[in-house]
Amino acid sequence: MKSSRQNRGMALLIVLVIIALLSTLLTELAFSTLVDLRLTETFRDTTRAYYLAKGGVNAGRMIIQEDRNGYDSLDEPWSQGVVNYPVGEGAISVRITDQNGKLGINAMVNRDTPSALMIDRFYRLMLALEIDKWGDPAELTAALIDWIDEGESPYPMILTEGLDIPVAGAEATYYQSLTQPYLVKNGRVETLEELALIKGFTPEILRRVLPHVALHEEVKVNINTASSAVLMSLDPEIDEDVADILIDYRKEAPIKRLEQLEEVLPEAAYIALKTLGNLEQLDLRSNFYQIEADAVVNDGRRRLVAQVNKKNNKLTFFKVD
């Protein structure tokens, strides 16, 4: 009898252990199923957000293509954008910015030959942004040239406004000597974030510089969309006061003819632009635009950044965040 009770007790214990194990397994399975379902929903919504953002990019391209007048300015439909526009279960924000109102840093070197005009402009941009509080504008300019050009010798001299400024650029030797060495690019800058790899371009400097530079290789600057700092980079005679005059003028109406500058600018500034040939390097239209599309669908989020060439409607840059 005693043995029989012991056997029944042991059987009951085994059953309880099995039930406990099954309960644990079922609980874990239920939790895992919920997690998988949640992950599936998030993946689904993120995918939907991606395609919603992609639709925003395509809509931006269409808006840019519809703009066919003889000038591009900040009062046109493409510059207005949309914020949190509801679409089905989600919402989208689209922002379009002109890139020809910025300095094209890849134009600083043309087929491995540094461009004196663009080097001068970039150096003056550094001065306009008061970068000298955080770094040496001439050294930064030289480091950027060395990052782009294919030569192995550091750029030796910045020539600007009649001054010869000795500099020590940065080629392979510098980057290989770092604690965590890497290769110098010796080629075109592909993303603006890449500038963080270049000697001297600290986060503080980049915060000030990035809004005023672009990846394109065009020399001409759209004066209808250029910032005060970019306008000041165009010629030594364009100081902050002259730049403000130009910006105030275009707020009333976009500049539609370069000849209008003679009416707008002080005589010395206009003559300097015309005499030095800088007037020919200005434009009233833009070829390159950046489209930023942010989409949200429930818990799914996607951000796309694209740059488009207006001439052929082709993307020159595309990034998914």
Task: Mark where each language-model region is.
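Compositionally biased linear targeting/interaction segments
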Residues: 2-321
